[in-house]
Amino acid sequence: PFYSDKYAKIGFQVNELFDDELLKEKVYHVLETKNILLEHLYHKDPINPEELLATLREYREMVAPYVCDVSAYLDKAIKEGKTILLEGQLGTLKDPDHGIYPMVTSSSTLAAYGAIGAGLPPYEIKEIVTVCKAYSSAVGAGAFVSEIFGDEADELRRRGGDGGE
């Protein structure tokens, strides 16, 4: 739902939490679409705009101490010679452009996307370190190209302590 909301431009961005008039307008606008889907597609009760506003205002207070201009924050850290650690997950085969479509995730899993997601210029990525398990695992339905079945799979799960994430 996050990526569909983002690209349909009906999601919320953190900065919108801090402008109460804009937030209220956005809540009512978003719920015009969301409530139609909830009621007619999912057969669920509509979301009350005033209740959602109250919840979002609570979230605003929770995140306020941690909100900043991330690009400026990281730029300052780079200029001060600090080390920045970016984390990615899943790997290339789950990337929506380079993975095994349609068994992919919604956002890029490639190391190069780390700079984009963090708001850093790509030339600031000086080193990429990859950490991976000795074997791949996945949850959910869909093809898993390197999947092993039977006794061998059970033995890997037992030794690796992997019951599915």
Please provide the spans of the model-predicted regions.
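Non-transmembrane, aqueous-exposed alpha-helical and coiled segments at domain scale
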Residues: 1-165
